[in-house]
Amino acid sequence: MIIGIGIDIIELNRIEKMLDGKLKFMERILTENERNVAMELKGSRLTEFVAGRFAAKEAYSKAVGTGIGKEVSFLDIEVKNDERGKPILITSTEYIVHLSISHSKEFAVAQVVLESLSR
């Protein structure tokens, strides 16, 4: 049963500006594993990566119904890719999580659908 849906869209140029202080911003929103991947990227690919993770985490927090804040932080959520490149969202909550991330020249968008484990 679907228990939550969240979506977020972010302007890439907004993330690009925040990446000027690269490490501080990335430490605030990316887990250590995500930062390790990000440090290997440059230019527009880095911006897309960080924006996609930012949007995915915001979308998840909206699907849960809390937003980013006291109950859910950026560092409580990790986005990895499976062997085919599909993004997978990792959290400590007990939901089935469906995640989609997309980019254009100007935006990154992510959508999360949460299902309960019991059917």
Swiss-Prot record:
Its cofactor is Mg(2+). The keyword Transport does not apply. Mg(2+) binds at residues 8, 58. It comes from the Bacteria. Pfam families: ACPS. It is found in: Cytoplasm. InterPro entries: 4-PPantetheinyl_Trfase_dom (IPR008278), 4-PPantetheinyl_Trfase_dom_sf (IPR037143), ACPS (IPR002582), P-Pant_transferase_sf (IPR050559), Ppantetheine-prot_Trfase_dom (IPR004568). GO terms for cellular component: cytosol. Belongs to the P-Pant transferase superfamily. AcpS family. Transfers the 4'-phosphopantetheine moiety from coenzyme A to a Ser of acyl-carrier-protein. This is Holo-[acyl-carrier-protein] synthase. The lineage of its organism: Bacteria, Bacillati, Bacillota, Bacilli, Bacillales.
